[in-house]
């Protein structure tokens, strides 16, 4: 299944706020109206919607998300927590959380078009897994810095999570540590996502 490129507002009306996909938010009460129209949700649908939230927020294909779930399942610790850490440490998401892009699709475009350096080297893979002590910067050219400055100017100034440090005048971000679950910028029950996939096998 390919990455979603359809109407974004349609998704947030059904699933709630997805800040990685769009800065728009559903109207207050729209979630309650949707529930009343469709009646009581089945357990399967609840698990499916949590999975879809994760997929659309991070801009993943179905195959990519399944791959992350399998990697998380083989790691030590809670599968759900490891899954969120893997997704949060993607380069496109780090750029978004630093405020160097307004959405994750915009961050992915910056990476694909070779505007971003990690530790002084161009990285053009949005799924690149960042590590503590990584230094993320814009390329030292006018176009790259102008694009990021535009995002700084147009985006709402969200607080940068504690595992990151932003130096906006240098167009630079630092990864201080692996993210803690309380800094995740999405309202999600990751255990339901893991349960969804465990029931598919």
UniProtKB/Swiss-Prot annotation:
Keywords: Chloroplast, Plastid, Ribonucleoprotein, Ribosomal protein, RNA-binding, rRNA-binding. GO terms for biological process: ribosomal small subunit biogenesis; translation. GO terms for cellular component: chloroplast; small ribosomal subunit. Residues 20-44 are annotated as: Disordered. The keyword Ribonucleoprotein applies. It is found in: Plastid, Chloroplast. Residues 89-169 form the S4 RNA-binding domain. One of the primary rRNA binding proteins, it binds directly to 16S rRNA where it nucleates assembly of the body of the 30S subunit. With S5 and S12 plays an important role in translational accuracy. Belongs to the universal ribosomal protein uS4 family. Part of the 30S ribosomal subunit. Contacts protein S5. The interaction surface between S4 and S5 is involved in control of translational fidelity. This is Small ribosomal subunit protein uS4c. It comes from Eucalyptus globulus subsp. globulus. The lineage of its organism: Eukaryota, Viridiplantae, Streptophyta, Embryophyta, Tracheophyta. The gene is rps4.
